[in-house]
Regions:
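Class I S-adenosyl-L-methionine-dependent methyltransferase catalytic core
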Residues: 1-212
Length: 212
């Protein structure tokens, strides 16, 4: 695993880092960007900015690892046929501005991927009951992940479902084990890279300023 610190556009990933060049090109990219909605939710500890540094939409679109014109094409670290799993915000006061639905698709395209479908994480409480989340119009109980492709990747199996259920982690924005085992690691045998990671995972290259 590589611990390569990168939280802002001014501190990009070291693209020549041996851990990256050794495992590239990556066939799966997972990303849970720090979307800039941190100050929109009232109350202590509710916004993303309370838990980690957020980025502007332009910084996310132009992310150096895979993003647009910023990346030197000679150092492309993503395979010609690859998958992108891009998490977006699924709760907020105004669905047009706080869920970043359209922006997530824009980011995927800016990174060179074509959006195809979505994965839905239906949350449960620690007791296995339905999660009662945030939202002003209705209370959300799910998170959404855009699945996009680059080139023509082929899934390893054909029976992967788009909806998963899992108990909510106490750690902000942490994704459940079932997301990796039942979807990501079934659709491709890697190599895998996770951007904006907050923990490590065996067999993955995990990049982020919170990676231990």
């Amino acid at each position: 695993m590589a611990r390569i610190l990168a939280a802002t556009a001014g501190a990009p990933y070291e693209l020549e880092h041996p851990e990256l060049t050794r495992h590239a090109p990556f066939k799966v990219v997972c990303a849970d960007p720090p979307w800039p909605f941190g100050d929109s939710l009232p109350g202590p500890g509710r916004g993303a900015a309370k838990h980690y540094g957020v980025l502007s939409l332009d910084d996310i679109r132009n992310h150096r690892f895979v993003g647009g014109e910023v990346l030197d094409p000679r150092r492309d670290l993503v395979a010609d046929d690859a998958y992108l799993f891009l998490w977006r915000v699924s709760a907020g006061a105004d669905i047009a501005t706080l869920t970043f639905a359209e922006e997530a698709y824009q980011v995927a395209r800016a990174w060179g991927f074509a959006p195809k479908t979505e994965v839905v994480l239906r949350k449960q409480t620690k007791n296995g009951k339905r999660h009662f989340g945030m939202g002003w119009h209705i209370r959300n109980e799910h998170e959404t992940c855009v699945l996009a492709v680059r080139g023509k990747p082929k899934p390893l199996v054909q029976n992967i479902r788009s909806v998963i259920e899992a108990r909510v982690s106490r750690r902000h924005s942490a994704k459940p084990e079932v997301f990796y085992t039942d979807i990501v690691e079934k659709i491709s045998d890697g190599p895998y890279v996770e951007l904006f990671a907050r923990s490590t995972r065996p067999g993955w290259t995990c990049l982020g300023d919170e990676v231990p």
